[in-house]
C-alpha cells in the first residue's frame, strides 16, 4: 500500500505512531504485531520531518499530510514520553477528529475490572492487576506494573520497571522515572501523586507528592538546593 503526500488517498486501515524517537521506534513492532494486516506508519509535525521518508522500513510522513489522507479507519498513537508535549499533541489530534488508538503488547497481563482509555501504550511484560482506572494516553514501559485499586490520570508516563502499588492516585501529566517505587496506600487514605509532578528514577515514594513538584531519593523528598547538599 503506497503512501503519497500531500494528497488524499483512499485506504482501508492506517495506524500512525506520532513521534520518531527511541520509544516510538520501540512501540512500532508492538503495533505491527497487534495489526499485522494494516498500514502502520510514523508521523511527526512537518517542522521535524527527516530527510528520509522512512524509519526502520516504515513510511514517515508529516502529521499535516496524514490529516489529508482519506481512510475508512485512521488512528494515531502518541509515542512521546514528555507529558506536556503529549497533552498538546493529543488536543491537536482531537481537534482533527482522528481516533487515538491504544497499543497493548500480547506479553502484558491485564486482570479483572481494568478500565483503559484511548491512546494508551502498554509495553511488553507490563502487569495491570485488578480494579484499576487508566486515563487517556498513559504510557507503561517494559516491566512496569500498576497494582489493585489505583487511578491513573491522563498523559502519565511510566519509564521501565516502575512499580505502582495498590491504593494510589496519580493525577494528570505525571512522569515517573525508571525503577521508581510507589508505596501502597490505604483504602481510606490513598497515596496521591499531584498533577505535573516528576518522580526521579530510583525513587521510593512513601507519601503524597504535591502538584508540579520533583522528588528524588529513598525515601523520596522534594528536589531543592538544600536536599542536594
Predicted regions and their residues:
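Short amphipathic alpha-helical segments
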Residues: 28-30, 55, 88-92, 134, ...
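Short alpha-helical
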Residues: 22, 84-85, 115
